[in-house]
């Protein structure tokens, strides 16, 4: 044989076997194909660009923001009302500190931490808007769990993943690796510290996480500054004296100016605080940004709707489309977001919305089509029959399909099964779109309905398997690659959208909620809206009694 081939299967792909083959090849020899010259070429091309001052935007900071950005202090906690520009201030402070450190150090190490995976891109966007010179490569922007995982890998500490060690519960796994202060203290000599560390959304952090970051990853004389809003404490972290507990002593520096001071959203949020948070948190004492505030009509559109005993998905869709087309018709789809808190409802709504509106959406979770597509490698008779029918109709002259054509057929099947699932629930609403989809994919509508009926039992079993599968990797990947300016309407859980903002938000409340931290979750959903907020409540009488008077009061002002 001319080639030396090593084959690893699912059973034989272990760390030991991989390393054995890796070092058996040229990788372990001095004369490597991957030379220093090639390495340096890759490094040169992939190195992030230097950020010039002119690349950023000129941002006019208010007096308090300027104070926080320039204050000569090594440790600070910043507390800000919603819409006060906490993240904008954070990145400006980070760049200001970087420039000071740059005088004595060629490449200062700056760490910006989040909790929410999707916020990395948001913070990076904010960073490149700063009107200063800096090298982006010197800034690490990452969420806590990915950061700890990477650092443990650097320390050569192997993590025992729960599904590999069935005796270890998930909670024990997180405590052992992500909350274990002693683990990092023992291995501190293996850690390369950061010159400055900034944490956004600090209310999401456990106290042990704060201690690990500050005690083990901060350089001596390093800067440690944290930002947050305790009223968005959606994970139920401990509260003392109406405030979250952190590892910085003393009262926080406060950002009190809400940049939405003339909006109904601000008034609605303050009413929410008075009604639900007065005994738990300090209420926001906002400072008016604009002179004459209150003399003119409030900006924005707020609406509350309550429904009982109606089909949820079609009703939500009708309300959203009615508001988009007639109330906020001047808002781009790019600036509209639908928020909820249960994935099954949001997935079905996403599929229904795309099919009926014929518009694309952006989600932070798996779509119904992706779920079906990921399971289409199964060899089942009914699936083979459907594949063959679509292949014959779409490629009549091909005896064998190319890889690209096979993938296309799979996508057809995934879309057909998705729309068929909706058709079973809402036949009158979906029939026209379903028929058009069948025509586009060159399969008879009546034929496909007959096919679904004949194979109903097998398809139901297939759907059950699809719904039970784990899609965590897909969700993580979609969150990592989420960008706000994608040109499409977004659909997300409140948790995943935390930290982001949207011009118009449709917030869905279902009939059943978990009371623990739901007030904070709802408040977080409220504050994602910059100007327009529509609440759609399906049968949750407890929150109906709270929210309706609130909206009535604000809308009468």
Over which residues does each language-model region extend?
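N-terminal accessory nucleic-acid engagement/regulatory domains that precede
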Residues: 1-44
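Conserved nucleotide-sensing/catalytic segment adjacent to the nucleotide-binding pocket
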Residues: 135
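Conserved helicase motor core of SF1/SF2 NTP-dependent helicases
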Residues: 58, 63, 76-109, 114-130, ...
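Conserved RecA-like ASCE ATPase "motif II neighborhood" in helicase/translocase motors
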Residues: 152-216, 489-496
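Short, surface-exposed amphipathic charged segments that create phosphate/polyanion-binding patches used
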Residues: 15-28, 75, 151-164, 267-273, ...
């Amino acid at each position: 044989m001319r080639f030396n081939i090593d084959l690893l299967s699912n059973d034989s792909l272990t760390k030991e076997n991989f390393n054995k083959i890796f070092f058996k090849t040229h990788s372990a020899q001095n004369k490597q194909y991957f030379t220093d010259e090639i390495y340096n070429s890759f490094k040169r091309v992939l190195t992030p660009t230097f950020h010039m001052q002119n690349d950023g935007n000129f941002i006019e900071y208010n007096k308090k923001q300027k104070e926080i950005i320039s204050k000569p202090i090594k440790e600070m906690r910043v507390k800000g009302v919603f819409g006060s520009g906490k993240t904008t201030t954070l990145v400006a402070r980070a760049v200001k500190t970087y420039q000071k450190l740059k005088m004595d150090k060629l490449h200062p190490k700056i760490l910006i931490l989040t909790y929410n995976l999707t916020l990395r891109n948001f913070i990076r966007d904010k960073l490149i808007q700063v009107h200063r010179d800096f090298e982006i490569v010197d800034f690490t922007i990452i969420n806590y769990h990915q950061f700890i995982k990477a650092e443990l890998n650097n320390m050569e500490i192997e993590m025992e993943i729960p599904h590999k060690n069935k005796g270890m519960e998930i909670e024990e796994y997180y405590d052992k690796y992500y909350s274990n202060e002693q683990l990092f203290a023992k291995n501190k000599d293996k850690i390369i510290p950061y010159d400055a560390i900034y944490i956004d959304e600090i209310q999401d952090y456990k106290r042990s996480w704060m201690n690990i970051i500050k005690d083990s990853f901060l350089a001596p004389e390093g800067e440690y500054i944290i930002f947050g809003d305790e009223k968005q404490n959606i994970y139920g972290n401990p509260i003392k004296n109406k405030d979250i507990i952190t590892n910085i002593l003393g009262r926080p520096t406060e950002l009190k100016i809400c940049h939405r001071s003339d909006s109904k959203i601000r008034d609605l949020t303050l009413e929410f605080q008075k009604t639900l948070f007065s005994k738990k948190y300090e209420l926001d004492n906002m400072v008016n940004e604009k002179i004459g505030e209150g003399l003119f009509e409030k900006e924005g559109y707020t609406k509350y709707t309550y429904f009982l005993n109606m089909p949820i998905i079609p009703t939500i869709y009708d309300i959203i489309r009615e508001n988009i087309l007639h109330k906020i018709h001047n808002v781009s789809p790019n600036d509209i977001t639908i928020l909820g808190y249960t994935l099954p409802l949001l997935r079905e709504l996403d599929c229904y919305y795309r099919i009926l509106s014929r518009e694309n959406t952006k989600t932070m979770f798996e779509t119904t089509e992706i779920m079906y597509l990921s399971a289409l490698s199964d060899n089942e008779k009914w699936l083979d029959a459907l594949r063959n029918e679509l292949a014959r109709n779409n490629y009549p002259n091909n005896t064998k399909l190319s890889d690209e054509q096979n993938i296309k057929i799979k996508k057809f099947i995934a879309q057909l099964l998705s729309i068929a699932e909706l058709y079973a629930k809402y036949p009158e609403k979906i029939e026209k779109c379903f028929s058009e989809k069948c025509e586009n994919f060159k399969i008879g509508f009546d034929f496909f309905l007959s096919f679904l009926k004949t194979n109903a039992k097998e398809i139901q079993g297939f759907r059950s398997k699809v719904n039970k599968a784990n899609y965590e990797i897909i969700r993580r990947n979609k969150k990592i690659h989420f960008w706000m300016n994608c040109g499409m309407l977004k659909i997300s859980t409140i948790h995943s959208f935390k930290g982001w903002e949207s011009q118009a938000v449709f917030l869905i409340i279902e009939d059943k909620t978990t009371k623990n931290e739901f007030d904070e979750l709802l408040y977080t959903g409220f504050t994602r809206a910059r100007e327009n907020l529509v609440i759609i409540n399906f049968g949750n009488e407890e929150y109906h009694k709270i929210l309706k008077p609130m909206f009535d009061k604000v809308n009468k002002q």
